[in-house]
Amino acid sequence: MRNLITIIVLFSGFTHVCFADNHKKAENAPEPSIYVVRHIEVDLEKAKDFEAAVETKTKKYNRKEGSDLWFTWKVISGPRTGQYARLFGVQSWADFDKANTSNTINIPRGNEESSYWRENITPLQKSKSVPTEVWMVIPGTEYNNLEAGQATRYGALYKWKMKPGMYQKKTKYEIQMSEALAASDLKVRGSVMRFESGGDYMTFGRWIGFNTWEEFGKFREWGNLGKIYEAKHGKGTWVKYLEGWNTIHQDGGETETEYLEYLEDLSSIELD
């Protein structure tokens, strides 16, 4: 399955996530702008059975040309450690109006794929009903320093809450940071998204996809992010960025970071 176009997320979900156009490589295909993420809890003793069941379902419904694309990540740090993030992406809100698809917010009960999930996988979940999030990508924040079509094995999601009325400034700052990361030599990809549903509307999430912890460490190395930012925007801009950042976000607002691992056997796209 190497002839595929891949993007992450999240993020978004998380962001870029893997995505394909009829499972054929199309480097100029539009990337999704909206992601729907379902967070699934499974008891530890049922985790292996759950993963095996989702793998079987994926091979049956989500690996053929023209099939609905679904992607599974496992949270490996943070408050939701051990949970599964099951998601898909669409290019516009109008895509949610399409019939005969599982790639929609409210899947019809008569959908064959949905029925299969309810019969074979739902019994392995802690709850029949799972929390669902909708995230929308902020235009201009996407970047990709990896080869076209390359999936990412890991992802990091950072969430902050802005102050009301700061949307334009928040967008400006996130675009500037994405420009700096895009101009760097870091082998990462990512974007910034905003909660549309399922959480605090003031919440933004920055997704970073990577393939090795060594490469991610270059991003997290103390002081390195400031150097990356100033390499793009000029000397002294990092301090100004931090000062502005503090005025944009809620004082004492909840922040959260979590790391995730991509489960290729439970997803439409395999890793290279």
Model-assigned labels for residue ranges:
Residues 1-27:
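Bacterial Sec-dependent N-terminal signal peptides
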Residues 20-272:
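Short S/T/G/P-rich N-terminal loop/turn motif that feeds into the first structured element of a domain
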